């Protein structure tokens, strides 16, 4: 009796465990069976052990079958285990099939694993996207600055989504083309009169090579006149030349002042030499007296000459007014 009770308890526990693992899988199996997806019950059960969500795989399989796509369950599982978005890939395949775009599962999975939004790429292939460039400033040959904004219509190229450049490259190339076109114009009026000249020139350069997009059109949304860069450059150059000339003039003035001071110093030096020479005269006269080369009459005659010279100088020089006299 006790043995029978133990067996019954074990059977009940076994049934509970089986229902725990199979119970939720049965509903998914029935759902797939009714939808014609044909996902095996054991396959659904063992998905849990493979760390794969059964509901996601079964739902994706049903969506693919209902849309007429033949994709195996193993492909869904392998893509999920690789880190891909199974639901987005299935939706992209369905959208591509409805739009008559050749997109195999392997290519869609590769695009998804590369980090691209494959569903958005398919939608952009059907409905092109408009990208607006930021404000681009460039200067024409006459020195006038022009500011332009353009709208680029692009369509996704599914064949180049893996390894192709993104929107940033398109914007950079278009901006470079606009700057080159405006810079090569002889006058800013030429660009203002023919804005389509920019779009035609830029579009003819094949800017979409090596990118994941195909440029359909480039439209100039707005062109504004900016600063007169040429005049500003000339003004700055004139101001710089003025400062250089002022610096050179200041240098010449400093040199002239230094030379003037040097000449004054030389004059003082010459005067000092004269005074020194005059101081040697009495010594020379005394030596002449001792040697007998100069007599007393000669000495007085020389004194008379000096006195006459001083008198003539005093007569020739006008007297200065004495400020102390009333």
Curated annotation (Swiss-Prot):
The chain crosses the membrane at residues 3-23. The keyword Cell membrane applies. Its main location: membrane. The keyword Metal-binding does not apply. Keywords: Cell membrane, Membrane, Transmembrane, Transmembrane helix. InterPro entries: FloA. One of its GO terms (cellular component) is membrane raft. It holds the Pfam family FloA. Belongs to the flotillin-like FloA family. This is Flotillin-like protein FloA. The lineage of its organism: Bacteria, Pseudomonadati, Thermodesulfobacteriota, Desulfobacteria, Desulfobacterales.
């Amino acid at each position: 009796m006790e043995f029978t009770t133990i067996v019954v308890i074990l059977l009940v526990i076994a049934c509970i465990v089986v229902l725990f693992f199979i119970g939720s899988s049965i509903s998914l199996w029935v759902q797939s069976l009714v939808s014609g997806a044909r996902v095996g019950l054991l396959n659904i059960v063992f998905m849990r052990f493979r760390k794969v969500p059964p509901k996601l795989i079964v739902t994706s399989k049903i969506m693919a079958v209902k849309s007429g796509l033949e994709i195996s369950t193993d492909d869904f599982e392998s893509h999920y285990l690789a880190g891909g978005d199974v639901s987005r890939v299935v939706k992209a395949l369905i959208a591509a099939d409805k739009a008559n775009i050749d997109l195999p599962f392997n290519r869609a999975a590769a695009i998804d694993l590369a980090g691209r939004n494959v569903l958005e790429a398919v939608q952009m292939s059907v409905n092109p996207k408009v990208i607006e460039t930021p404000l681009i400033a460039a200067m024409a040959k006459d020195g006038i600055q022009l500011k332009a904004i353009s709208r680029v219509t692009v369509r996704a190229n599914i064949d180049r989504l893996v390894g192709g450049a993104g929107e940033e490259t398109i914007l950079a190339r278009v901006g470079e083309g606009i700057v080159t076109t405006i810079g090569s114009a002889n006058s800013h009026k030429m660009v203002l009169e023919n804005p389509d000249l920019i779009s035609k020139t830029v579009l003819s350069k094949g800017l979409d090579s090596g990118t994941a997009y195909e440029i359909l059109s480039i439209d100039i949304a707005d062109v504004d006149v900016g600063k007169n860069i040429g005049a500003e450059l000339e003004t700055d150059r004139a101001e710089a030349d003025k400062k250089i000339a002022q610096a050179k003039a200041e240098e010449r003035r400093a040199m002239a002042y230094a030379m003037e001071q040097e000449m004054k110093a030389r004059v003082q030096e010459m005067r000092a030499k004269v005074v020194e020479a005059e101081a040697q005269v009495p010594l020379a006269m005394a030596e002449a007296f001792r040697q007998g080369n100069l007599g007393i009459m000669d000495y007085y005659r020389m004194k008379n000459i000096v006195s006459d010279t001083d008198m003539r100088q005093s007569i020739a020089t006008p007297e200065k007014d004495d400020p102390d006299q009333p």
